């Protein structure tokens, strides 16, 4: 039987306050810190920082 995968599902939420988010996976062993990445927010219609939050 295979072991559990090392990747967690995470939600990247916009810091612009629009409520828009992306979902992705992250390797929890190699990158234990919170992810922050610049991505396009279609509601704000510009590139903004997206911060990692847990999927509820």
UniProtKB/Swiss-Prot annotation:
Annotated Gene3D superfamilies: Ribosomal protein L33
Pfam families per the UniProt record, alphabetical: Ribosomal_L33
Stretches the record annotates as Disordered: 1-30
Biased composition regions of type Polar residues, renumbered to the chain: 15-25
UniProt keyword annotation of Ribonucleoprotein present: yes
UniProt KW keywords: Ribonucleoprotein, Ribosomal protein
Basic and acidic residues bias (residue ranges): 1-12
One example GO MF annotation: structural constituent of ribosome
Listed GO CC annotations: cytosolic large ribosomal subunit
A single BP term in Gene Ontology: translation
Family that this chain belongs to: Belongs to the bacterial ribosomal protein bL33 family.
HAMAP family: Ribosomal_bL33
Protein name: Large ribosomal subunit protein bL33
Gene from which the chain derives: rpmG
